Every structure is written in C-alpha cells, then in structure tokens.
UniProtKB/Swiss-Prot annotation:
Protein name per its UniProtKB record: Glycogen synthase
NCBIfam families per the UniProt record, alphabetical: glgA, PRK00654.1-2
GO molecular function: alpha-1,4-glucan glucosyltransferase (ADP-glucose donor) activity; alpha-1,4-glucan glucosyltransferase (UDP-glucose donor) activity
Origin superkingdom: Bacteria
Catalysed reaction equations from the record: [(1->4)-alpha-D-glucosyl](n) + ADP-alpha-D-glucose = [(1->4)-alpha-D-glucosyl](n+1) + ADP + H(+)
GO CC, alphabetical: cytosol
Residues reported in the UniProt entry to bind ADP-alpha-D-glucose: 15
Listed Pfam families: Glyco_transf_5 (PF08323), Glycos_transf_1 (PF00534)
Species in which this protein is naturally found: Francisella tularensis subsp. tularensis (strain SCHU S4 / Schu 4)
Family affiliation: Belongs to the glycosyltransferase 1 family. Bacterial/plant glycogen synthase subfamily.
EC number, UniProt record: 2.4.1.21
Length: 489
C-alpha cells in the first residue's frame, strides 16, 4: 500500500511543535504493516538544506505567485524516508519561523504558500511521479487542509474516481483562516466557497476544507475526538464534526523509541531502565540542578515544564501555584517560549527564587530530554490538549505526569487516587477542574506521594511499563487506510 503524507514539519529537520514528531514517527511505524510511505513538504530552507540524492521530477511554470517551481524527490540523511520537496524560493525561502516573520506576524501570503502544497499533493495523487502513485493521501493540520479539496476538485472535473484521503487534526485551534477575497486565487471550483466547503463565518478556512472534503478524519486522542464535537472545544466546527462523527477517529500519538528511550538516550547524564531508575534519575537530576544553577538537593521534588508559553498550556494557572511548590521545598525547571508577558513573569520568578526556579526561554530539543530525565514530575496543566506528547515522554522516563483531565492527557495518565494506588494502575496526577485550586491540590498530592517513597517507586515503575509506542496506533491508522482502499476497488 502506498501512502503520501503531506505536512509542513518533519523532525529532526524542522519542528515548531508535536506535529513534527508525529509526521516523522508515523511513516516508519506504518512500514511494519507493509505501508510504503512518502512525505511531501514545502521547500523551506531547512528541508532544502537537509535533502540529498535529489532528482528533479518536474518544473512547473508560475503558479500561486511563485515564479519558479521545481518538484524534487529526495532522501533525508540517516533515514529511509523518501521525500518530495516543493522548491519555490519566492514562497518558501525565508529564514526563521516557517509561518511568520521576525515580528511573529503571520506571512500575508500563507494562503498561497500552503495552497501550492495542497495543489502539488493533488498532482502527485494523479501520477505526477510516473514511478510511484499513492493509494491514500494523508494530510496533516491546516497547512495541508486544502489537499482533500484539490483532490475532490480534480475528481469532479475529470469524472474519474480519485485516491482516498485522510485528514488529521493535530490542533483544531489553529485553523488557517484568511479573508474571503483570497478564494479567487486558490484555483478551486466556485461551489467550494460555501457553507458546504471552505466558507467559515465570512472567511476561508483551510482547516474546514480538510474536515469537509477528506474521506476520513483522524485526531490525536479518543477524548479529543469527542471534545471537538461540542461547543466548548469545537472552535466553531463542532457542527460539521458532529455530522461526520462516523468518519472521525481518535487515535493516540505514540513515542518514537529510537529518540525517546532512557535506556539509550545519548543526551542525558546517564542511561537507566525501570530496574535502575532510582540511581539513574538521581544522577540526571543532579546534572540538571547543576546545569540550571539550582540548589543541589536530591530530596527536592523537581517539577519539569517543557511547553509553548501560551494561555492554552495552562501557564496562567501555574504562575498562581508557584508558591505552593517553592514553599514546600520543591523546584521548577521550565523550558519554552511564546507569550512575552508569560516569559517575563517566569523570568522574574526565577530571579526571585534563583535556587528553586530555573527558566530557559526558547526551545532546545536536547535540553527537553535532560529536563524530562532529570525531573521527578512533568507538568502539563493545559486548558485543552489534543494529545500531548510531553506526558508520554514523562511516562517513558519515569517522570510522573501532572496533568489536567482533558484530551489526550485524560486518555494517557491515571491519577494516583487511593483506589488506583491500591490496584496498581496509577501513573501520575490528574486534576479535573481547570482552576488554580484544583491544580494546587494535585501539587499537594504529588508532594504527599513523594514523601511515601515505596508508593512513589511503585507508581514510577507502573508509569514506565505503559505501552506508549506507535505500534498499536499505527495499526489503527493502517486499518483506516485498508478500509478506504477496499472501498475504492
């Protein structure tokens, strides 16, 4: 079975969030089920500089504002992934963030940049590469939302049955919204600009295009699949998603054990397994405390936070709960960037409690590994969280997740309640209500369990035994593909 994945990010070449981890890990996981995957990406500088053995497939005349477009088939160093790259310098050859300028303002022509991505995907689905034609095209998030629309448009124009499409929502809150006036530049049928198409409250929505035109929709956890069908989490698309509930699947993301594995992680102070976790984590913790300038206290409960600094991630709650941690002798290490006001608040807290709180603004993949290995608790207090990967990394490294009961966090972390402790299923700490009071109670329960060393070790061992790799999730995705291919035959 041949599957084309269409996305804007791919780890380790280009990553701004968890999307990149998923698009890198899913194709190799699907290979175990006989799926021949290729990936299509925009020609951002990171991709152009990373590819090797490139072959020019076709040169396309000016389109979507791009003066010159070359489509290459290439390899990525140290992987087996075949990748198609759209080299259109006038659209993609820009430094830094792939979506926004140096002032963090979204590029005004993003609609053209990602329309080209969708249009090329449709051409590949029709046989642009004479040697490889996909049976399924699987697009990811709003950047690739127009992929199913262009494929459907081709089907309507030709009268021929098109390949089947799958669209994955990684985060419904980012929708790719543009003024209605841009529709004329997208080269799509006029009938697509309607409520039954791209129109969304007087705007054009790339996300809605994917949700409406794809044959099947997946999102990244069972709970999130339910949440986005109701008003509170539906971002205005809950009606469409509820209408399509029979085509909507919640499939958890997984952890790539080649990258996230304490037994062989070369980025952490020492390797460890579930049998050597006590001594291993103690060494990683000391190394982290030394690196970040914290007091070197083995018995201090260390809370790690690796996140984008946004209101969605629950950082406003955490600010209010800092005193609860420091007053009990706990420590905090935070890695992240985002909202400037939040950055300033956390930097001020680190200055005030320099031996208890350390903050590193920015994103550093290596430091993320060190924080997750060296912390006792990994905090993910998000207001909403489609899946979340950080808590899965925490489970893998024996770093107990403290999470809000929402989305994928609710699906993957089992609270250390008395009942769950008694039956040996507890893996972390879960708070139900998105409030400072509820978060504070969870923090107190973490301290209480930490003081009961035997119970803490049991929960940590259970956490590390959780099956959070891609194996079972890839099988579920494969079954969706298989059913679609059967429908098309």
């Amino acid at each position: 079975m041949r599957v084309l994945h269409v996305c804007s990010e791919l780890y380790p070449i280009l990553k701004t969030g968890g999307l990149a981890d998923v698009t890198a890990a899913l194709p190799p996981a699907l290979a175990g089920f006989g799926v021949d995957s290729r990936v299509l990406v925009p020609g951002f500088p990171a991709f152009i500089n990373a590819i090797k053995d490139k072959q020019l497939l076709i040169n396309i005349p000016s389109r979507f504002g791009a003066e010159e477009i070359n489509i290459f088939l290439a390899k990525i160093s140290n992987t087996k992934i075949d990748i198609y790259v759209i080299d259109a310098p006038s659209l993609f050859a820009r430094p830094g963030n792939p979506y926004a300028d140096s002032s963090n303002q979204a590029y005004a022509d993003n609609y053209l940049r990602f329309a080209l991505l969708g249009w090329v995907a449709a051409r590949i689905s029709e046989g642009l590469d004479a040697k490889w034609k996909p049976e399924i095209v699987h697009s990811h998030d709003w950047h690739a939302g127009l992929v199913p629309a262009y494929i459907k448009a081709s089907e309507l124009a030709s009268g021929k049955k098109a390949v089947k499409t799958v669209f994955t929502v990684h985060n419904l809150a980012y929708q790719g919204l543009f003024p209605m006036s841009v529709f004329a530049e997208l080269d799509l049928p006029g009938i697509f600009l309607s409520m039954n198409g791209l129109e969304f409250y007087g705007q054009v929505s790339f996300m809605k295009a994917g949700l409406y035109f794809a044959d099947k929709i997946t999102t990244v956890s069972p709970t999130y699949a339910k949440e986005i069908q109701i008003y509170e989490q539906g971002c205005g698309l809950e009606g469409l998603l509820a209408d399509r509930h029979n085509d909507l699947y919640g499939v958890l993301n997984g952890v790539d054990p080649q990258i996230w594995n304490p037994k062989k992680d070369s980025l952490i102070a020492t390797n460890y397994s579930s049998t050597t976790v006590a001594t291993g984590k103690a060494k990683c913790k000391l190394a982290l405390q030394q690196m970040m300038g914290l007091a070197e206290k083995e018995d201090a409960l260390l809370f790690g936070i690796v996140t984008r600094l946004t209101e969605q991630k629950g950082l406003n709650l955490l600010i209010e709960a800092i005193g609860e941690i420091t007053s009990r002798g706990g420590q905090i290490v935070l890695l992240g960037s985002g909202d400037k006001a939040l950055e300033e608040v956390f930097l001020a807290a680190a200055k005030k409690y320099s031996k208890s709180i350390a903050v590193q603004i920015g994103y550093d993949e290596e430091q993320a590994h060190r924080i997750i290995a060296g912390s006792d608790v990994i905090m993910v207090p998000s207001r909403f969280e489609p899946c979340g990967l950080t808590q899965l990394y925490g489970l893998t490294y024996g770093t107990l997740p403290l999470v809000h009961k929402v989305g994928g966090l609710a699906d993957t972390v089992i609270d250390s309640s008395l009942e769950n402790l008694a039956d040996g299923t507890a893996t972390g700490f879960v708070f139900d209500e998105f409030s400072v009071e509820s978060l504070t109670l969870a923090i107190r329960r973490a301290f209480a369990l930490y003081n009961r060393k035997t119970d803490w070790k049991k929960v940590r061992k259970t956490a590390m035994q959780q099956q959070v790799t891609w194996d079972s999730s890839a099988e579920k995705i494969y079954q969706i593909y298989k059913n679609l291919v059967r429908e098309n035959n």
